């Protein structure tokens, strides 16, 4: 990589030594504005058609968004037509404002008002880029020229709104605010405010976007607090944030911006947007929810939200995405699973509504997820999750090496079928592989042992087995039944085998409880497990040896 100090320069700080935002907390939800249908849509490889837009729009209404940016109607006929559909057929509640975006160009402003005819309290969101870099290399204008673009647009928009009979709301964005000197951003915003003349019953939205995330979140917060202190007519302004996620800190940037005095947030569901995306409104809302703050939008059916997002955007949500990912409520670490299990049990016993479960900052049920999701198994699952399923639902405590081995069998299923494997199917596959073994060559029936008169301390075992359906008696010697039976089977099948590890446990309580034994066997070329279940612990262990031998013989025969 090139020398960083020669190629890049650090972002300037604000010098706000008396900043107050670090001592603030977020104790109420901001005004939310979804920009999924505009900023999110323009970032898609395959932009939404009408059906995909309509489905997303319906979800946003159901979630309770009161401000929805529906498009850029002057930029395309598709967006214009969708705006008309929303107004004429979208069944928009009276308390919902449709927002549209427009550049500060006369012909585009005219077209925008045509698109908004008949809308109730629509928001006209006009913008122009104000950054030092774009002033210099894109527009080749000084600050006065850039300010004039904004003020000319503000005059035209307010005049057209008045001629249309009023009822319009206005939003102005100094685009690339993060690349604009604070004094310049302030000068332009104040000039726009003077023209719009906002009032208590029709405040002007001043949107201060992190169009490109260029600094740590604390510096953005300083900039927001500085603007809130210095903007004219602040009491009649709504300060809005529009963060992107270029540095991966969009959530933190937004939260600190709210602490710094902002009133409103523009973002998208699950963070779709240009480059690395817009800020994720769902994560923001649920972060507030888990701090005891009503987020003001309904995220109780996160599975539907995910489905609509993936259908409308033709994008997949990562498994580890906060709150919604397939694996966020699933623990694979054995210690994590144990802590969750104990926490859930303790919660049931506690006489409180307070949620306190290790590793789960939110109750999955609050967002429409089931508790089974904590132990669900799919193609991304590991040995820990599979072991947890078998332990929690069927009382099987698999040894670690068996967890690793059996997880490969489940992985084969998920890879082949591409869908979730339910707990019942996992248990059936375990029994089929290690216990019942339909079609296997060998089956243990009975045994007896007696002292080996030739070698002190050793015993002879005589066991009755089925070999390809034929009853056979085999014998061997060893220090105990397992050792002797392994010797007998090795001689019988002609493969040298030995026990590497053995464990057993009861599956239920009581004198007639079944026990399960696990045996790891080594043979020339590898090692494999077997398992046996019986009310007699010795019989269970010999069945486990037989199980492992069947798998070894089957492997050798390939």
Curated annotation (Swiss-Prot):
The record's listing under InterPro entries reads:
2-isopropylmalate_synth_dimer, AIPM/Hcit_synth_CS, Aldolase_TIM, IPM_Synthase, LeuA-like_post-cat, LeuA_allosteric_dom_sf, LeuA_N_DRE-TIM, PYR_CT
E.C. designation(s) = 2.3.3.13
The alphabetized list of GO BP terms reads:
L-leucine biosynthetic process
Q: Where is this protein chiefly located?
A: cytoplasm
List the GO terms this entry assigns under cellular component, sorted alphabetically.
Answer: cytoplasm
Q: Where is this region: Regulatory domain?
A: 437-558
What stretches pass through the bilayer?
none
Extract the Gene3D superfamilies matched here.
3.30.160.270, Aldolase class I (3.20.20.70)
* Gene Ontology molecular functions: 2-isopropylmalate synthase activity; acetyl-CoA C-acetyltransferase activity; magnesium ion binding
Q: Does the keyword Metal-binding apply?
A: yes
* Catalytic activity entry: 3-methyl-2-oxobutanoate + acetyl-CoA + H2O = (2S)-2-isopropylmalate + CoA + H(+)
Q: Which UniProt keywords apply?
A: Amino-acid biosynthesis, Branched-chain amino acid biosynthesis, Cytoplasm, Leucine biosynthesis, Magnesium, Metal-binding, Transferase
Q: Which residues bind Mg(2+)?
A: 39, 242, 244, 278
**Which compartments does it reside in?**
Cytoplasm
The cofactor named in the record is: Mg(2+)
Pyruvate carboxyltransferase domain mapped to chain residues: 30-303
In terms of Pfam families, this protein maps to: HMGL-like, IPMS_D2, LeuA_dimer
Q: What is its pathway?
A: Amino-acid biosynthesis; L-leucine biosynthesis; L-leucine from 3-methyl-2-oxobutanoate: step 1/4
Q: What does this protein do?
A: Catalyzes the condensation of the acetyl group of acetyl-CoA with 3-methyl-2-oxobutanoate (2-ketoisovalerate) to form 3-carboxy-3-hydroxy-4-methylpentanoate (2-isopropylmalate).
Sequence similarity: Belongs to the alpha-IPM synthase/homocitrate synthase family. LeuA type 2 subfamily.
Listed under subunit, the entry gives: Homodimer.
Q: What is this protein called?
A: 2-isopropylmalate synthase
Encoding gene, per UniProt annotation: leuA
């Amino acid at each position: 990589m090139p020398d960083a100090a020669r190629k890049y320069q650090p972002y300037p700080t604000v010098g706000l030594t008396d900043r107050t935002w670090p001592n603030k907390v977020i104790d109420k939800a901001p005004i939310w504005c979804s920009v999924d249908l505009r900023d999110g849509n323009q970032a898609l490889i395959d932009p939404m058609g009408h059906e995909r837009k309509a489905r997303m729009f319906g979800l946003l209404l159901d979630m309770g968004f009161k401000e929805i940016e529906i498009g850029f109607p002057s930029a395309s006929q598709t967006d214009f037509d969708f705006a008309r559909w929303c107004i004429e057929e979208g069944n928009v509640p009276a308390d919902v404002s449709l927002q549209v975006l427009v550049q500060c160009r006369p012909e585009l402003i005219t077209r925008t008002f045509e698109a908004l005819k008949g809308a109730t309290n629509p928001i006209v969101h006009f913008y122009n880029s104000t950054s030092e870099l774009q002033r210099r290399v894109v527009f080749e204008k000084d600050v006065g020229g850039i300010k004039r673009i904004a003020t000319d647009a503000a005059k035209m928009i307010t005049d057209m709104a008045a001629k249309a009979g009023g009822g319009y709301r206005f939003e102005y964005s100094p685009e690339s605010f993060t690349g604009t000197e604070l004094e310049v951003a302030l000068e332009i915003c104040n000039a726009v405010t003077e023209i719009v003349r906002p009032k208590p019953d029709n405040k002007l939205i001043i949107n201060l976007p992190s169009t490109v995330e260029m600094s740590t979140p604390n510096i953005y917060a300083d900039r927001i607090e500085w603007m809130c202190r210095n903007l004219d007519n602040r009491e009649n302004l709504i300060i809005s944030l529009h963060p992107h996620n270029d540095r991966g800190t969009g959530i933190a940037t937004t939260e600190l911006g709210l602490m710094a005095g902002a009133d409103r947030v523009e973002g998208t569901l699950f963070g779709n947007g240009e480059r690395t995306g817009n800020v994720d409104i769902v994560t923001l809302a649920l972060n507030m929810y888990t701090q005891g703050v009503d987020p003001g939008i309904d995220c109780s059916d996160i599975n539907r939200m995910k489905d609509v997002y993936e259908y409308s955007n033709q994008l997949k949500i990562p498994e580890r995405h906060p709150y919604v990912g397939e694996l966020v409520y699933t623990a694979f670490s054995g210690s994590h699973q144990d802590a969750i299990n104990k926490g859930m049990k303790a919660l049931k016993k506690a006489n409180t509504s307070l949620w306190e479960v290790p590793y789960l900052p939110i109750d999955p049920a609050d967002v429409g997820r089931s508790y089974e999701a904590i132990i669900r198994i799919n193609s991304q699952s590991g040995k820990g999750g599979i072991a947890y399923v078998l332990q929690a639902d069927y009382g099987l405590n698999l040894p670690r090496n068996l967890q690793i081995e059996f997880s490969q069998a489940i992985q084969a299923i998920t890879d082949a079928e591409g869908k979730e494997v339910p707990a019942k199917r996992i248990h059936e596959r375990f029994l089929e592989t290690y216990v019942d073994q339909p079609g296997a060559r060998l089956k243990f029936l009975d045994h007896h042992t007696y002292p080996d008169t030739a070698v002190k301390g050793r015993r002879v075992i005589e066991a009755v087995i089925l070999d390809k359906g034929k009853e056979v008696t085999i014998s061997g010697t060893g220090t105990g039944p397992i050792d002797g039976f392994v010797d007998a089977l090795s001689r019988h099948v002609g493969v040298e085998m030995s026990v590497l590890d053995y464990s057993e446990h009861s599956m239920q309580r009581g004198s007639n409880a079944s026990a399960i034994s696990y045996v790891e066997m080594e043979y020339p070329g590898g090692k494999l497990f077997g398992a046996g279940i019986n009310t007699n612990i010795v019989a269970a262990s010999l069945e486990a040896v037989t199980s492992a031998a069947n798998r070894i013989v089957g492997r050798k025969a390939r």
